[in-house]
């Protein structure tokens, strides 16, 4: 029986080879418009889920620390051909689950759609 369960787990893991749920770097592209020219920028972002377990409620000031997928960011500049105005865009260098900083990040519940594979 254990062999059947292990085979099933390995088969499912193989099916979702491209799926990653943990915090990781992901390549994306998005369009930018400058000088009437539209061009796609290719960059990396942090994506994925961080483990969180709600503890037993004790009081108003005893909330669990929320972890989010974030990392070190830099900014790069791209010049679109035929346009003197440069485009600055963020690039994630690494990602990890860190404490949510409400000063620069929304730490509430995400009400949008979360795809099964990012």
Swiss-Prot record:
Summary of subunit composition and partner proteins: Heterodimer of an alpha and a beta chain.
Main subcellular location of this protein, as a coarse class: secreted
PANTHER family registered for this protein in UniProt: GLYCOPROTEIN HORMONE BETA CHAIN, LUTROPIN SUBUNIT BETA
Sugar attachment sites: 27
PROSITE patterns: GLYCO_HORMONE_BETA_2 (PS00689)
Organism, scientific name: Trichopodus trichopterus
Protein name, per record: Gonadotropin subunit beta-1
Protein keywords: Disulfide bond, Glycoprotein, Hormone, Secreted, Signal
SMART domains in the cross-refs: GHB
Location of the protein in the cell: Secreted
Lineage, highest ranks first: Eukaryota, Metazoa, Chordata, Craniata, Vertebrata
Family recorded in the similarity comment: Belongs to the glycoprotein hormones subunit beta family.
């Amino acid at each position: 029986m254990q062999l059947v369960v292990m085979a099933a787990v390995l088969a499912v893991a193989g099916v979702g080879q491209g799926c990653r749920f943990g915090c990781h770097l992901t390549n994306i592209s998005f369009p930018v418009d400058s000088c009437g020219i539209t061009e796609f920028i290719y960059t990396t972002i942090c994506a994925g889920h961080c483990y969180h377990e709600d503890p037993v409620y004790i009081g108003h000031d005893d909330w669990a620390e929320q972890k989010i997928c974030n990392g070190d960011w830099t900014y790069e500049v791209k010049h679109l051909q035929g346009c003197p105005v440069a485009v600055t865009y963020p690039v994630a260098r690494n990602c990890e689950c860190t404490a949510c900083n409400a000063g620069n990040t929304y730490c509430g519940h995400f009400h949008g759609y979360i795809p099964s594979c990012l």
